[in-house]
Regions:
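Short beta-strand His + acidic residue motifs that chelate non-heme Fe in jelly-roll/DSBH
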Residues: 62, 81-82, 106, 111-117, ...
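Double-stranded beta-helix
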Residues: 7, 19, 23-25, 89-92, ...
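N-terminal juxtadomain amphipathic helix
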Residues: 157-179
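Conserved short histidine dyad/triad with adjacent acidic residue
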Residues: 50-68
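Short acidic-glycine-tyrosine-enriched beta hairpin
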Residues: 86-108
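A short, N-terminal "cap"/entry segment at the start of jelly-roll beta-barrel domains
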Residues: 1-47, 61
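Glycine- and acidic-residue-biased ligand/ion/polar-headgroup-sensing regions
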Residues: 67-86
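His/acidic/aromatic-lined binding-pocket segments of jelly-roll/cupin-type domains
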Residues: 63, 69-74, 96, 104, ...
Length: 179
């Protein structure tokens, strides 16, 4: 029992994400009776914006980008994002929730899958070419690591807010198979 507690404690203190992927809220918000303005600073030029609509209960991605950093600004909905460093054979699968209004930034060579827990709309912001004919060749390489059974398991078991206070910003803890 002590060795398991020690292992869980050690794992819980590791920063497993290591800047592979991170989620940010908008900054410098302005709110009045008309609504809200939220700003997201981008650190590199963007030459392509894709508008993507996805239905609740579906999967997108299951791929990685060998050179491009991908930024996704979620305007509606929610996803469970699953990602893994493909350059590190010991890298665990890591999950996190991305909510409406948040920006997800995914580094090159990070396999990622989006499991849609709600009907979702997001802007895909990239630098570089994204010709559909080059899918699997230059900008996006298929890497299936979340199948339909795993998607269903995530959707049925994932907790999106605290059962006590309703907070949506839950801290990830060690679980079997995921971080």
């Amino acid at each position: 029992d002590e060795s398991i507690k020690e292992m869980i404690s050690k794992w819980s203190k590791q920063n497993l994400i290591q800047n592979l992927e991170h989620v940010r809220d908008g900054e410098g918000e302005f709110v009045d009776f008309r609504g809200k303005i939220s700003n997201h600073e981008l650190t590199e030029p963007i030459n392509l914006i894709g508008l993507i609509d996805s239905k609740k209960g579906t999967i997108r991605a299951n791929h990685y980008h060998p050179q491009q950093e991908q930024k996704c600004l979620f305007t509606k909905g929610q996803i469970i994002e699953v990602f893994q460093d493909i350059l590190n054979p010991n890298s665990p699968k890591i999950t996190q929730v991305v909510n409406e209004g948040q920006l997800s930034i995914i580094k090159p060579n990070v396999a990622h899958t989006m499991v849609f827990s709600k009907d979702t709309t997001f802007l895909n912001l990239v630098r570089g070419e994204r010709e559909h004919n080059n899918y699997g060749v230059t900008h996006t390489i298929k890497h299936i690591f979340v199948d339909e059974a795993e998607k269903d398991l995530l959707l049925s078991c994932y907790k999106f807010n605290c059962r006590c206070c309703g907070n949506k910003n839950l801290k990830r803890v060690v679980s079997l198979g995921y971080q």
